């Protein structure tokens, strides 16, 4: 399917895009991959293997000639993608993974692609030596590569463990990492009793230490998928995790071009390739960057910490406008009223904010915000309401404004208590952390200290906002 006949470009919702700061740097391997893409109809003549302008990023893809804004700099045909459907069609996957009933082993799309990559990497059956994607697999990091993912990798070195201790003293980050690690450990335990057991039974006689190799390859594969895959690159592609060869070699820049889908002129809904557009005029030898967020959806820009947990780095380069965030979570608990109508009114009001009894409500507090998020205040007002408060919210149609002085006092006191505890959890002052940064520390410790500084700032900011909101409520004459 030749791509040069296509002019329709569809900008895509990009949620979970890739990064390769330390990928395989052998030029011939990348050139072989580019040659494959060209043979399949991809646009790769604009790029060559070069060196990144990002400190420590190593290899990059650079332009061989100037290109104007809006040009497709590089594209990859659809049949080169590694998708959920590809993984589930693999014979080894069918026999040793998908043969387990869902109640024993539920395999979502990301796990399917992860296990497929693991099997291809280990080449247990010998079939991977002739894999269609062999040139792509060769471009991936080696099995012993250390990804900068704290939930999986930082415990492996003394330097990493010291940085992890600092990172875990940041309350929001600690909560997130503990959850990620717990989910990983549960997955590993379930896989050992099912997939790994099945593979070990079938191939241990020909592959020494297979169980150990499976565990190592799974962590490697999970790290690759986490840092390189796209979520929902297009509605026509099933699954939440898709690997796009070549495009996952691009380094990240917030000013870079987001992933685009190229469709046939006469069939706009039929996609045949994916690529990256030039967001400005670019010159010879300039690096091709990818942006990790929907370029037309500023409200869906990931927070700095989201980038770190997902891709292993802090996006601090250039004029990034990414916010630092603090994930605040609390269970939704409400009293049961004597009047059924009041109970229904409360449930309907909560539903407007995608909340319901028994849920764990999560909200991101962002550094620099002028006040607390409406969703946080509204949900808490509804949670601590009595029947009189609910009746008032029902008459208004919402709980965007304080309902009563008693109600608002409970709301603000709840947030104050939580954020005071979070601030007390942080052992040092911001000044101490900044001085340590200024004196010079390793990269992992620098990341941990920066995150702790900003989480502390958000705790202090939130407590100040609560004071202002309380003073405002006290001055409202209609509140009793």
Spell out what each predicted region is:
Residues 92-102:
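Intrinsically disordered, low-complexity polar regions and short flexible loop motifs
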Residues 108-111, 298:
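Secreted/periplasmic proteins
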Residues 4-21:
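Cleavable N-terminal signal peptides of Sec/SRP-targeted secreted and luminal proteins
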Residues 22-80, 84-89, 104, 120-480:
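Long, positively charged leader/targeting segments at protein N-termini
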């Amino acid at each position: 399917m030749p791509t040069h006949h296509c002019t329709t470009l569809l900008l895509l919702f990009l949620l979970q895009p890739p990064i390769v700061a330390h990928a395989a740097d052998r030029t011939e391997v990348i050139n072989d991959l580019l040659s494959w893409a060209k043979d399949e109809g991809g646009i790769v003549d604009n790029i060559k293997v070069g060196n990144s302008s990002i400190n420590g990023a190593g290899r990059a893809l650079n332009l061989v000639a100037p290109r104007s804004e809006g040009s497709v700099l590089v594209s990859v045909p659809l049949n080169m993608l590694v998708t959920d459907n590809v993984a589930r069609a693999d014979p080894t996957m069918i026999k040793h993974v998908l043969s387990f009933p869902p109640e024993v082993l539920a395999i979502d799309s990301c796990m399917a692609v992860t296990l497929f990559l693991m099997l291809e990497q280990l080449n247990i059956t010998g079939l991977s030596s002739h894999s269609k994607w062999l040139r792509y697999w060769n471009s991936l990091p080696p099995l012993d590569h250390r990804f900068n993912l704290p939930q999986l990798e930082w415990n492996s070195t003394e330097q990493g463990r010291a940085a992890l201790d600092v990172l875990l003293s940041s309350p929001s980050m600690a909560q997130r990492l503990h959850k990620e690690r717990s989910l990983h450990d549960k997955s590993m335990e379930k896989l050992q009793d099912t997939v790994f057991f099945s593979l070990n039974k079938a191939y241990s006689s020909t592959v020494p230490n297979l169980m150990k190799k499976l565990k190592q390859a799974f962590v490697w594969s999970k790290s690759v998928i986490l840092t390189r895959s796209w979520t929902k690159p297009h509605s026509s592609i099933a699954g939440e995790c898709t690997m796009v060869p070549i495009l996952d070699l691009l380094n990240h820049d917030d000013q870079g071009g987001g992933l685009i889908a190229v469709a046939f002129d006469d069939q706009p809904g039929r996609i045949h390739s994916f690529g990256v557009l030039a967001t400005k005029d670019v010159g010879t030898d300039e690096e091709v960057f990818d942006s990790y967020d929907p370029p037309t959806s500023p409200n869906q820009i990931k927070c700095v910490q989201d980038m770190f947990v997902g891709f292993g780095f802090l996006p601090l380069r250039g004029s990034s406008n990414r916010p630092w965030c603090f994930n605040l979570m609390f269970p939704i608990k409400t009293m049961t009223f004597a009047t059924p109508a009041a109970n229904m009114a409360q449930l309907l009001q909560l539903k407007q904010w995608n909340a319901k009894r028994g849920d764990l409500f999560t909200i991101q507090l962002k550094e620099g915000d002028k006040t607390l998020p409406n969703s946080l205040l509204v949900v808490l007002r509804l949670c601590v309401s009595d029947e009189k408060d609910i009746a008032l919210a029902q008459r208004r149609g919402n709980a965007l404004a304080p309902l009563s002085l008693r109600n608002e006092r409970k709301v603000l006191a709840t947030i104050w208590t939580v954020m005071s505890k979070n601030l007390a959890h942080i052992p040092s002052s911001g000044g101490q952390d900044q001085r340590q940064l200024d004196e010079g520390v390793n990269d992992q410790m620098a990341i941990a200290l920066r995150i702790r500084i900003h989480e502390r700032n958000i705790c202090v900011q939130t407590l100040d906002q609560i004071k202002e909101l309380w003073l405002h409520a006290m001055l409202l004459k209609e509140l009793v």
